[in-house]
């Protein structure tokens, strides 16, 4: 739709990336900051350095990384960083671009119409979200850490193990002794858990999110699909999440 020809490359293998650049001579590159697959291990700064050395302009998708990392894409060598303000407790339909002044000025030039410009009230909502997000991320991370200790300490007998995964959002992967994942999810939503994200880490996500493993995680480990679920605490505390989990299991 944008008139682009897509070239794919494995960022986990810098040698292969260099070969792709030499062979295809791309005009630009898009790099996602957060990993998309369990086996992703690339270091963002190294990928961007490889692209920059070859003269390839780079844009990073910093969704789910902003406010959680020491440096976003443009601070690691990308020409521009982009992210959704909605995913930082901001207003719907507003994104942010940070980076090279010439790129930003060209974007501004395309937004000459009043209908396409961000209004003052939206800008203030973005600002409030940027202040609010790191605090809520820290609170949420604390809930996840405490839940991890409780579940691995035997708080729910049916739980085999729990780990924290940076699957874009930081979530708990909870594995059961028995293949009861689908039934737990069915019961959990009856007890107030969210069955689907409405815009991960948005201002609307208040109850905990109980949902199935992502497609990439299921592909990497198919047997886990029936025995494990994801839990994102959102704005909920560990007691609420444990209650929903226990009552869901008891209802099976």
Indicate where each model-derived feature is located.
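Conserved glycine-rich beta-strand-loop-beta hairpin in the small C-terminal domain of fold type I
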Residues: 144-145, 161-173
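Short, flexible, solvent-exposed loop/turn segments with mixed acidic/basic and small polar residues
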Residues: 83-86, 159-165, 216-223
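Conserved C-terminal alpha-helix-loop-beta "cap" of PLP-dependent enzymes
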Residues: 168-249
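Conserved PLP-enzyme active-site core in the AAT-like
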Residues: 1-137, 141-159, 186, 247-248
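Short secondary-structure junctions
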Residues: 8, 156-163, 191-198
